[in-house]
Each structure stands twice: as C-alpha cells, then as structure tokens.
Amino acid sequence: MKWVESEWTVPNAFPPPGAIPGVWYSASTWIGIDGDGSPDVLQAGCDSDVMNFIFGTMRQLNPWWEWFPEGTFWISNFPVSQGDTMSCLICVDEGSNTSARIYLMNDTNGAHASFAVTAPSGTTLEGNCAEWILESLEIDTSVPELASYGAMYFDACNSGTTDNTFLNAGNANTMNMLDSNGNVISEGAIENQTLVRCTYEGPLP
C-alpha cells in the first residue's frame, strides 16, 4: 500500500454499562497502513475518551498520529468536538518505505495539520494492508476498555498501491472487536464500495 484516505464523524463516546467511576474508556477512530500481519503501523486519527466521576462525566478528544512501534504523538492546537467531520490522508513518499506524509483536517472548523514522518529506527513499512479502524487506543502499552459509541461511519475509504492499483472498502475484509469471553463488542460492516460502518455491540462484562 502506498496511500490511504477517509473521512468520518467523531463519535460521541459514553461510558459503557457497568463503567467504573474514575476509569477512562476510549473510542479511537483512525486510518492507517500495515498492522494486520506486519509488525509496524503508520496511523493517524482522533481519540475520544470518557470517564464518569462523582460530579458527572468528563470527556476529552485528542487527535494523534503514530508510527508503531514508536509511541503516540498528540497533535496540539487542533480543536475537535464530538460530531465534527474529520478527514485524513496518509501517503508514503515515492520510492521509500521509511518516510511518509500525514494530512489531518477538521472539516467542520477548518483546523488542519500535516507532518513529514520517519519510521522508527529498524522499522520499515511493509505496505501489506490499508485500515479503517475504531478501537480502544493503546497508549504506551496501556489499553483502556472500549467506550460505548453507538454507530459511526468511515466514508471515502480509498487506498492505492505502489503499482498505482486503486482499492477501496469494497476490496476489504472486516474484523470485529471481542471481549475476553469472545463476545462481539464492536462490529464492522462494509456498507458499500467506500463506506464502512462500525457499531457498538456491548456491554462489556
């Protein structure tokens, strides 16, 4: 894979049924290259976190990018709210598997950011897949439980290969998120050639 793009609406995350007060829950939306069957992931998106506490509910939204196995880079001065429309394009530099560019935009308020990024030492991009993902974001080896998010959609799910083959969601396979008992808590579905739906199917145990 050489590039991947999409746009999506930032979900309104809620604590799942049985949520523990004082514990953060996450619904992170992102697109990327690699990760399924490869040790690297080049990715960017927005993390939606939510926590119940004694005085109510606290939320935070943080745009980010990451070239795993290096850690997450949080993007500052990039305002985002639930319900905003985000768009992202990730492009590998021509003839390279260690450098790329990331373009992230909040189409609702006009905020935008771009980054020229370099692979972590010893890492190369395999380019074996493009991804459109909703999950609980792993942050520095810590993985919060999944927040309840209802349903959300990735639109304009397009990608391309180094030999200029154009691909989209119609060429993709779906993967579901399971709890520790094997129950589906987040389900993916391909709605059409460029539209992917993610649906919360909790609650968590």
List the predicted regions and their residue ranges.
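Exposed, interaction-prone regions of secreted/extracellular proteins
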Residues: 1-205
